Amino acid sequence: MLETIHETHVVPLGIGYYTVPEAARLLRTAPRNISRWLDGYSYRGADGNMVKSSPLWRAQLPRLGDALEIGFRDLIELRFVLAFLRQNVPLNVIRRCLENARAIVGEERPFSTHRFRTDGRSIFLESLREALPAGSAEDGSAVIDLKTNQLVFKQVVERTFKDLDIEEGLVVRWRPYGGKPSIVIDPARSFGKPLAADFGAPTSALARAAEAEGSTKRAARLFEVPVSVVNDAVGFEQSLMAA
């Protein structure tokens, strides 16, 4: 469940606020992955020397000491990164795609834009070509790879954008419970905590109430919301725990 914002940390309104563990829970990934992608990391190269891998982008929120905290747009960009990785797209291709998309879209976080939804295929395929090993175009393996990855891109974009709301060219909301309208993550509301969309109650509070009361009906009466809303909140919170 989302943690309380540090008392001394002033978060600009409308951006959203997530600690690394909170974001990892919503994205169903390990916290270390988010830290590596947004903080960078080091690894030992083939020659035995340490190599520094830079962050994929800079987080929306300023650092408070050593703590990495991210905004809503960061969360959605990370969701795309994960979607590509889960389709076996290498991280170096994703990094190149981000760089190329930034230059074309003009946004630091280009995946969470309408422009990437419409023009991203060509950006992705060009990034893939640039990342292909030398000589693969001559032996024909590039053709197979590009055809396969056209389908990969289509699947990632269709699945990832289907539960996102876009306004003025940018992703502004995420409906994280299978796209159902009852639950929303909106950076303009409660710092981006998952909420019952029409009532504003945090899903975590609804789920806790249902557990404490031993009944979704009693929790619904307590919060003055329909039982179906509590059921969805409980289902959503349980899905995060099971991930």
Locations of the language-model features?
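Long, charge-rich, low-complexity intrinsically disordered regions
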Residues: M1-R36, S42, K52, G65-I70, ...
